[in-house]
Amino acid sequence: MNTVLFSPYTTRGLTLKNRIVMSPMCMYSCDTKDGTVRTWHKIHYPARAIGQVGLIIVEATGVTPQGRISEHDLGIWDDDHIHGLHELVGLVKEHGAAIGIQLAHAGRKSEVPGEIIAPSAIPFNESSPTPKEMTKADIEKTVQAFQDGARRAKKAGFDVIEIHAAHGYLINEFLSPLSNRRQDEYGGSPENRYHFLGEVIDAVREVWDGPLFVRISASDYHPDGLTVKDYVPYVKRMKEQGVDLVDVSSGAVVPARIDVYPGYQVPFAEFIRREAGIPTGAVGLITSGWQAEEVLHNGRADLVFLGRELLRNPYWPYAAAKELGVKIEAPVQYERGWRF
């Protein structure tokens, strides 16, 4: 059987062997608290490459120490991080997968001790600390930190960079009127609220000529927040700036009750793909081979991003291939167990 799921996908000169992407998921496993790659990362990510995932995106990696979600996150704010990341890249590529990294700043959702920063001095919830409103100097330093992170990612050998503009972290905080009450050129109108992300994309593109993805939260799930329709002009601008694919998630900029069900975010990816004319990745409770194939076959997205499913089963591509009646190449060491 010919499937879209197991067909190659090419973006900006990089060809993935299939359309299966490991979604960036924080492991909170840097026990040294210095942002460096640890043994866990060297086992966790290559295991999915052995499992035949096409593209593995490393978890949200802090572009500054205070930009981490927690002290146990990976970092890319210092040249000392390059060696460990380079080693991780080599291990993943050795087993046939492409590898990307998600550059991130947690903004007001950072749980690192010390001062936290955000577009406006609005806490995430009642139990969260109030962040410092960023000055223009803070903004300039943070844009520079994203560029420096991209430069280090290139030195480490990554194939793809994804900018984290979702889930209520710093860039998402600038985009949403729920968290951005600024009165300068970085707040107010939708165009102004996009300004920070626009500067980050331009800064990254100055030093990075490879595939560039952006993860977005296509709905704030709040009557006064952003909807998927609001994201269409944002994504069109991203495309003009050289973004190659938008990874479409949703929520988490403010506390909200979200009804989740199989493929609940796929319609967002489909809408963005159709209305903005850009390749998209679908993510969120995609669990079976047939479900993933339906999303791709019907043109609802170009790639499928799997999160928890790949935590449960590093060899999900094999299970999906068996389900769809597709024979895929097995690691030589596993051939006896992968025959069907």
From Swiss-Prot:
Annotated Pfam families: Oxidored_FMN
Catalytic activity annotation: A + NADPH + H(+) = AH2 + NADP(+)
Enzyme Commission number(s) from the entry: 1.6.99.1
Entry cofactors: FMN
UniProt KW NADP keyword: yes
Role summary: Catalyzes the reduction of the double bond of an array of alpha,beta-unsaturated aldehydes and ketones. It also reduces the nitro group of nitroester and nitroaromatic compounds. It could have a role in detoxification processes.
Family: Belongs to the NADH:flavin oxidoreductase/NADH oxidase family. NamA subfamily.
Oligomer status and interactors: Homotetramer.
Protein name in UniProt: NADPH dehydrogenase
